Amino acid sequence: MKRISTKEINRLALPAVITGVIEPVISLTDTVMAGHIALNTKEVLGAVGVVSSFLSALLWIFIQSSRAITSQVAYAYGQGKLSQVKGLVAQILLLSLGISLLSSIFSFVCSQFILERFYDAEGTLLEYCLDYFHIRVWGFPLTLLTLTIHSIFRGFQNTSWSMYISILGGVINLVFNYIFVYIFHWDIKGLAWASLLAQGTMFVVSVIIMYQKTPFKFFIVKGIHPKFLQSLRMSADLLIRSSMLQGVLYFSFLKATLLGTDGDHTIVATHTLLNQVWGFSTFLFDGYCNAGGLISGRLYSTRQYESIRELVRQLFYVVLGISSAISLIYFLFYYQIGTLMTENTDISLLFYENFWIVILMQPITAITFLFSGVYKGMGFTQVLRDAFIIATLLGFLPAFYVCENLLEWGLSGIWAAFFVWIVFRGGILFLHYLSFFYKRSVQPSV
């Protein structure tokens, strides 16, 4: 058995942690800035949450085509056959470009219908949503292509390039958020323009590095690559999984919006903050989960099952330790975090009533993400799809019905259902891992 060294894990994980933190920081920066805009704070904060939710849904649904390419590149890297996937990478890049442009155009044209019909936005909230949406939607193609390129970098066993690019984007977003909001007084439009500028910069730099450091490029390939259909099948599995994820998140935002009475947007604004904190937390340990996926994909290509078991054991304790530390910090600075997020008293009080659920979810979320990352890396997309369907249908929906319709817990009911959902997701993958990998014969290291 070839034991994966801690140094190798950290080489991939630490840059991925920083990259992962920067991504939600860009979104979190918009949220914090919105929470400190004095005029119509609740509506501005709600608009940022609603639009960010839709764009994230769009992104994480269509990003699955690029997520699948990571395992394909990792396989080729492990076998020393990168030249055989040049055409496949080019076709995935062109596919991402076409999908993203069509999606942005369609979303821009139908923006008011989407916000009114699916998010129940109206009045002042709708006006702010449209202002923010009409700018941010054009960042979608830039972000999708950037993340596709970063997926290629990860399959290439390099996470440092993505880290440098993400840091650059985060700094640009932070600086121009301040300039556009506090100096130019563009308010919510300033938030949108700062994000778009950061996304454009990250895309340009990503393309430059891809051309200079990897054998992959944008070019038109004659004929379909032999592995293109396999990649599409894996993408379809992840697409179903991601669609259900975004359906759950959309459902939660819709319910949070409907829970508000007489135009009060306190609940949806608070739900936005809780989602942002939860998302930020996951990226603190998701770098190690991603590293597990990259290494496991390489090991699985040569059937090194015992090495995979040892890798998972190492990472299990790492992510559990990180998530437990996050929970402890959140408990110690419980009220300070709420004050940092917003100065609105109503939102702060509701935040304090529900934040403890987010804290308790951290260790379970970390373990769930670990097995998700490992399974993505090995290309076990059907297992991920099926686990998600079961967790949603048998976990989230029944829990949501009980908490909201029978117990009437309001926002607490939404997050209690999230808790049950994440337990189901992690539990199913853990049981599958035990049944699959502990029945496999040990292969010699190569």
Where are the regions a protein language model picked out?
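Small-residue-rich hydrophobic transmembrane alpha-helices
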Residues: L45-I105, T146-S162, V268-L332, A366-G379, ...
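Short runs within selected transmembrane alpha-helices of multi-pass transporters and secretion channels
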Residues: I63-S66, I135-R154, S162-N173, L191-S206, ...
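Short alpha-helical transmembrane segments in multi-pass integral membrane proteins
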Residues: M1-A16, V73-P141, I172, I183-A236, ...
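Hydrophobic alpha-helical transmembrane segments in multi-pass integral membrane proteins
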Residues: F396-E404
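Hydrophobic alpha-helical transmembrane segments of integral membrane proteins
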Residues: T6-E8, L12-A13, E23-P24, A57, ...
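Transmembrane helix-bundle signature of multi-pass secondary active exporters and lipid flippases
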Residues: V17-S71, R136-T143, R233-R298, V319-S327, ...
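Hydrophobic/aromatic residues in alpha-helical transmembrane segments
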Residues: L14, D30, I69, C110-S111, ...
